[in-house]
Amino acid sequence: MAAGQPARSGIDFSAFRDSKLARELIDRICELVGDRTINLMEVCGTHTVSIGRYGFRSIMPAGLKLLSGPGCPVCVTANRDIDHAIALANIDGAIITTFGDMMRVPGSSTSLAAQKAAGRDIRIVYSPLDALDIAEQNPNRPVIFMGVGFETTTPTIAAAILEAEARGLLNFSVYCAHKTTPPALRAIANDPETAIDGFILPGHVATITGLAPFGFLVNEFDTPGVVTGFEPVDILQGICMLVQMVVEGGSAIGNAYRRGVNADGNPVARQLVEQVFKPCDTTWRGLGPIANSGLSIRPEFSRFDARARFDVPVEATVEPRGCRCGDVLRGAITPSSCPLFGRTCTPEHPVGPCMVSSEGSCPAYYRYRD
């Protein structure tokens, strides 16, 4: 595609990669920060990777810290959930289906990848609808989908459950480990150790939720947030808007991603989720138990709920010794401060989940380190 030519979506992305505009935003950020210390946190794995790829941490003023938060769904999945999925793989005849990132995440003593190598039937799928096809092709075998993700992926899981009901695929079920973003942000805003001055809010999540669910950051904590896109100018604009609010003493929920996010989000997708799921308490790696931060399958769809259908013994949870993934996820440290980072823990040989996922902060720091 020629430079400046609009993409198929009709959006000309060259403006969001304009080096002159990026330089102007960087200069403005440096001017605003001055000799202040400002802590901003991104809570989206795609932002984490983009910030690393574009080298933004190294060109920001010394007083501006860009911290990575709990934006990677694989990373925040508790060991107990991974152990439970592995236990389900031991059911006679079971087929476990999962997104690829979950395969190498270490549980207490093993991983889905190791169990696959040992002979368990564990398959990578690119959509939960692929798991439905597998269930249809194997009517006498239980097919369990490992459901992990935030608001962006949950509607597709809800749609898959409704489709399973319509197709009469009673051998299909979902192990639901889905989480919602705002309660985790509240936990971080309440944490005095992190002292976050502003949040770079996730553009993908906000396409579903809209802006309103983040309003508590302003109302309860007087902390600004800006929904941000993923191109260089998007991210710099979001940072600039946040820094300006911090410096001027204001707080609001801004939108620097108007081409992708509107104030109301996607009500149809939310209605689909509410039809199939209900809020529940769940445990986040690094943040611990958080009330109403998870989703469970409603009783009327319990026949598709792997937790309800299968009573399996799950091993006692053991966390990897020395791994500080939890501290990374809540922004208490950067990945390079973990004693295992780049030594015993690398993308090729991960000790903790933060080094496994393509959206994890640890591989992003490892790949784009100076």
Residues covered by each model-derived region:
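Internal helical hairpin/lid segments
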Residues: 237-327
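Secondary-structure boundary elements
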Residues: 137-141, 163-170, 191-194, 223, ...
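Flexible, glycine/charged-enriched surface loops at secondary-structure junctions
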Residues: 37-40, 171-172, 248-258, 284, ...
